[in-house]
A protein has these predicted regions:
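Catalytic cores of TIM-barrel enzymes
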Residues: 1-122
Length: 122
């Protein structure tokens, strides 16, 4: 019988051998996944099509929801604050279309413009 994600994580951080390698995608800004890749992974696993939330807009990291966590066998779940790294509340999500055509969600009070290169400016 394999150990739970929690047990394997506990073994890992205590420098003991877990049942298997602990998998972390998307729980931090370091292990995050770009919004375009989150959408492609959702499609690959046949999950519901919906806009990905840009939980970290500087790197354009997407929210890894519980259905994708289950499909990929991810062990670590992120705990995000009420605001993103720019201090913008993570609420009242609004639809945004990226320069590559992907529809994503940004926090409602995340205000931006585009420059002549198509870059997002805050």
């Amino acid at each position: 019988m394999t150990a739970s994600s929690r047990n394997n994580f506990t073994e890992t951080i205590n420098h003991r051998q877990p049942d298997r390698v602990v998998v972390d995608f998307g729980s931090t800004g370091v292990t995050g996944i770009h919004i375009a890749i989150v959408e492609k992974l959702r499609n690959y696993y046949g999950l519901e099509k919906r806009p990905v939330k840009a939980v970290e807009p500087y790197q354009m990291l997407g929210e890894v929801e519980s259905d994708l966590i289950d499909a990929m066998g991810i062990d670590v779940v992120g705990l995000f604050g009420a605001k993103n790294m720019f201090g913008v509340p993570a609420e009242d999500w609004k639809l945004h279309k990226t320069i590559w055509g992907q529809e994503v969600l940004f926090p409602g009070s995340f205000n931006y413009t585009y420059n002549s290169n198509g870059d997002i400016l805050m």
